């Protein structure tokens, strides 16, 4: 037989302890003189009600006392307090069956709680193996253990009875996490809500979920039902699902049915699914009656449907689509006026596409004298566009595209910045702009304009020997040195150098010798120098000694022609005297 599920599981430690009576709400179960344990303070803090206090100030003071007893502010740090809060919330969000077992382990941190849950999941059958039949579990409360399930059920049933005062005694009521009977029914038939209603998200979220309605006032717990699969379908289930359904049962021998004490159902109201799972319906007409969601069992997500089988299952749940009505077009003349265009005869198969040309809508009235006010069409006709609308749409595309990138060179307009940058790069690779003066090529017209300015700039410095002009005086001076050299010592031209290089090794040796010739010669002593500054230094020190030297040193008899040389010489005297003064001390 399949494994049945019971919503109440007794913790291992509680079953071994002696039977105790529950303490009244708000009373401290600890011995006199001893403070309550943190777990007791936590439960009292969570279960505290406003009606237990005399007023709002007393209620707030009581909450402060319980919170301090739970978190122990004088002992714990901020990180430890945060760990306690996270652990309490983690245990609260666990399923009820696993939560009872984990709380019985008394974890002190979130890591210990996670390790306990993981150890429970790693064992064979996963958490469902620990869910077993239990008659009436012993309720034990010593102030440190978890809350008993019976009290939580009573509180939940009382809250649900207030929410549904008109519900019949035997009806199922949907609560926050459980599908339970009304307060008049016994608590042994309580089953988890997830076992009866399984939500499935699909592309048909807008359609109501087709479920099987149980007979009124005859609701059986999920543990007494039998889920039967074929041998082929059983092999497709994973270990978690096989642990959930229990042992293998042949589909021809059993079906999803009521317990044996229930009367048999009519064979006309049951249908078989191709995947081996049989679902029995106790309703006569699903289309005429509304199906209450609280008393429904949806087994669609429990089946390993794939491919064609899943499509057939969805077809059984979703009604057939009705044919879509024909296209309804209503036209009215635009304010601009004009004659209506000739429409085709088959308007029911055509779809007009409206293109907004501007945010204000002023340009729309200039292109089409008729505007479409209402349009309904099946989605399969969206590809067909009438001929009289294609031209208007083409014009709209040209006007709506904001081409804000203009090439400054060729004047092309681009809508996207990427295409504009790609065009500029291609322009840089090409050099279509040529200088009319020197013939240099440029990729941009701006570069060419900047280059032409160099040709048109003023050159006030002109050479008197050859007539060349220069913008800077330093360029003119370096140019005049060529004319000061003798004709035999002037540097060779480029054409002569190229001719000597092409003649052979002897010509190349001659070229090196000609370059090694001294090109600057002194006019007084006929000495030659390779550089002009060497010649100037030679004339200053050798041939200009007889000239007057007006600058004389104050510390020695040396004279100088320039004041700069005198200052540099006196600086040496000052350094020498400062060293002597330091050595004297």
From Swiss-Prot:
Q: Which GO terms describe its cellular component?
A: nuclear body; nucleus
Please note every region of biased composition (Basic and acidic residues). 11-20, 373-383
**Record-annotated KRAB domain positions:** 220-294
Where on this chain are zinc fingers (C2H2-type) annotated? Answer: 405-427, 433-455, 461-483, 520-543, 551-573
Is DNA damage there in the keyword field? no
Q: Name its GO BP terms in alphabetical order.
A: negative regulation of transcription by RNA polymerase II; positive regulation of DNA-templated transcription
What ranges does the record give for the region Disordered, renumbered to this chain?
Answer: 1-41, 141-167, 358-397, 483-506
User: Motif Nuclear localization signal: residue span?
Assistant: 575-579
For this UniProt record, give its keywords in alphabetical order, as a comma-separated list. Answer: Activator, DNA-binding, Isopeptide bond, Metal-binding, Nucleus, Phosphoprotein, Repeat, Repressor, Transcription, Transcription regulation, Ubl conjugation, Zinc, Zinc-finger
Which residues in this protein are found as Phosphoserine?
Answer: 182
Q: Where is the SCAN box domain?
A: 42-124
Under the subunit heading, UniProt states: Interacts (via zinc-fingers) with JARID2. Interacts with NSD1.
The record's comment on protein family reads: Belongs to the krueppel C2H2-type zinc-finger protein family.
List the protein's name: Zinc finger protein 496
Q: Which organism is it from?
A: Mus musculus (Mouse)
Q: Could you read off the lineage of the organism from its UniProt record?
A: Eukaryota, Metazoa, Chordata, Craniata, Vertebrata
Q: Gene behind this chain?
A: Znf496
């Amino acid at each position: 037989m399949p494994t049945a599920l019971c919503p109440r599981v007794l913790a291992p430690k509680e079953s071994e302890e002696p039977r105790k009576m529950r303490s009244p709400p708000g009373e401290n179960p600890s011995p006199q003189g001893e403070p309550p344990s943190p777990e007791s303070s936590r439960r009292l803090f969570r279960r505290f009600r406003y009606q237990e206090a005399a007023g709002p100030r007393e209620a707030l003071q009581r909450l402060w006392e319980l919170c301090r007893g739970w978190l122990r502010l004088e002992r714990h740090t901020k990180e430890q307090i945060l760990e306690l809060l996270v652990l309490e919330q983690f245990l609260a969000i666990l399923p009820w069956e696993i939560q009872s077992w984990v709380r019985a382990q008394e974890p002190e941190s979130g890591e210990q709680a996670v390790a306990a849950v993981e150890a429970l999941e790693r064992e064979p059958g996963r958490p469902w193996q620990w869910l077993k039949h239990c008659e009436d579990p012993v309720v034990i409360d010593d102030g440190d253990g978890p809350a008993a399930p019976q009290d939580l059920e009573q509180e939940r049933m009382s809250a649900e009875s207030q929410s549904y005062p008109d519900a019949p005694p035997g009806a199922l009521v949907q609560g926050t996490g459980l599908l339970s009977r009304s307060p008049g029914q016994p608590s042994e038939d309580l089953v988890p809500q997830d076992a009866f209603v399984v939500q499935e998200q699909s592309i048909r979220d807008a359609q109501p979920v087709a479920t099987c309605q149980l007979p009124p006032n005859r609701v059986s717990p999920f543990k007494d039902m039998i889920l039967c699969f074929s041998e082929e379908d059983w092999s497709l289930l994973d270990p978690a699902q096989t642990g959930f359904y229990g042992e293998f049962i042949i589909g021809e021998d059993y079906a999803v049915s009521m317990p044996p004490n229930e009367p048999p159902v009519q064979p006309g109201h049951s249908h078989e699914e191709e995947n081996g799972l049989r679902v029995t319906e106790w309703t006569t007409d699903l289309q005429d009656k509304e199906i209450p969601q609280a008393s429904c069992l949806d087994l669609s997500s429990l089946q390993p449907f794939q491919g064609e089988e899943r499509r057939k299952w969805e077809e059984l749940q979703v009604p057939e689509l009705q044919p879509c009505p024909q296209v309804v077009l209503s036209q009215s003349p635009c304010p601009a006026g004009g004659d209506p265009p000739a429409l085709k005869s088959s308007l029911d198969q055509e779809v007009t596409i409206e293109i907004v040309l501007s945010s204000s809508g002023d340009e729309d009235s200039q292109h089409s004298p008729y505007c479409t006010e209402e349009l309904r069409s099946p989605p399969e006709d969206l590809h067909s566009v009438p001929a009289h609308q294609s031209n208007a749409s083409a014009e709209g595309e040209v006007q709506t595209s904001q081409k804000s990138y203009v090439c400054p060179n060729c004047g092309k307009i681009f809508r996207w910045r990427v295409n504009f940058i790609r065009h500029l790069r291609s322009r840089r690779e090409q050099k279509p702009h040529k200088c009319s003066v020197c013939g240099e090529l440029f990729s941009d017209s701006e570069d060419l304009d900047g280059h032409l300015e160099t040709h048109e700039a003023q050159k006030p410095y002109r050479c008197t020997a050859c007539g060349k002009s220069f913008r800077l005086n330093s360029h003119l001076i370096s140019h005049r040195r060529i004319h000061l050299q003798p004709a035999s010592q002037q540097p060779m031209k480029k054409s002569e150098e190229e001719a000597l290089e092409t003649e052979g090794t002897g010509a190349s040796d001659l070229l090196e010798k000609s370059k090694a010739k001294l090109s600057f010669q002194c006019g007084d002593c006929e000495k030659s120098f390779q550089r002009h500054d060497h010649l100037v230094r030679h004339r200053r020190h050798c041939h200009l000694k007889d000239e007057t030297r007006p600058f004389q040193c104050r510390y020695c008899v040396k004279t100088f022609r320039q004041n700069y040389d005198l200052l540099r010489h006196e600086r040496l005297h000052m350094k020498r005297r400062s060293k002597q003064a330091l050595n004297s001390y």
